[in-house]
């Protein structure tokens, strides 16, 4: 039997309960969070790994599209360059696509935390300097990413508990595989 989880890659939408729980947590910043990659090769300088300039407000940080619209232009503007040189701007679909998969009960639970995120963003973002913006986005990233990881951990635990309960754990081989995961702001 194979049992597979969605890798905890974008979009990070943990359960509404984990979303609320981890939103209240604050995570330590890695020493390399503000690295500007000066003196490094082209690959390191051009990789889309900068939390401030590459993580999207709606898709990654879960700021409601309506909040972005009311605020007008939000700095820094997030723009991606496609392989053909054309520009790609994030859209509200990055938020509504994943959110739209939730049922009504889940959406009501998500709404409580989403309202807090959007209100905090609207009130504080315009007065933040770039360092504070990076710190804000880093916390949002860690909260969502680690909540997603925690959800995977919980469900792997459920499988292992089920194997024990059915008394087949000793006759079962469990193999864990993964990719390298996402950087947690460090490198």
Please report, for each region that a protein language model flagged, where it lies by residue:
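Glycine-rich ThDP/TPP pyrophosphate-binding loop and its adjacent helix/strand module
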Residues: 1
